[in-house]
Amino acid sequence: TKGGEVIVSRGELVEIGGKFRIPEVLELSGAILKEVGTTNRTRIEDYKAAVSEKTKAFLKVHTSNYRIVGFTESVSAEELYELSTGLIECTQELTPENFENHTERSGILVIEDLGSGVLINLEEYGLSKEPTVQEEVKAGADVVCFSGDKLFGGAQAGVLVGKKKYIDQMRNHPLLRALRADKFTMTAIEEVLKCYLDQKEAVQKIPTLRMLTRPVEEIKEKAMVCADRWNQEGASVQIRVEKCISKAG
């Protein structure tokens, strides 16, 4: 995308840990940032109106470290994929056989930064909905990136999944050798992925998921034990257990 335009919603121009900001990352990459929509509402029409001959990609960034609630609207990866396939005037009839290559002919990629990298449905455990990597790939995103630690539960690394054509292009980039993960990191990621072959095993073996999905009664029991031990010490400060909503991260 060097020298080309990357279209991003204004509501997704996030700053992550370490003061890294999406606009600055894009600038360093050589891409030209093109903002659309507003902080709280962005529609598919905003993306369509911003497309030009210089457009190389639609970038969707999941706001995993904050929320905008209330009068809001956003565009899904699936909608962006559908838009990218409709931007090219086909000279042949679109059939199931050539549909896969239709997006590639338009020349506009759909790239999504998921951040935490969830592989299971957290709603099954009473937690807020988070888009999974599988859902976004199935929705049509050409490349999905996420962290190897955080909710994924592995080593600190960046993970890229997507269409083979684009992953291969990144494999052949001159910077790969300097940025590639070492063997220990790769081994750690592989072992975590093996856990995900069985969701129940993943929830039990991966510390982050185990703590996030721990039943409320179990948490209460542990809290009561800690409080009792503290209070039995005769400290001047007494502890009591109360119901609350905790935040992870």
Model regions and ranges:
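Conserved PLP-enzyme active-site core in the AAT-like
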Residues: 1-196, 231
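Short, conserved beta-strand edge motifs with alternating hydrophobic and charged residues
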Residues: 147, 204, 238-242
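Short, structured loop/turn "capping" segments at alpha-beta junctions
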Residues: 167-170, 199-203, 237
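Structural signature of PLP-dependent enzymes
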Residues: 196-226
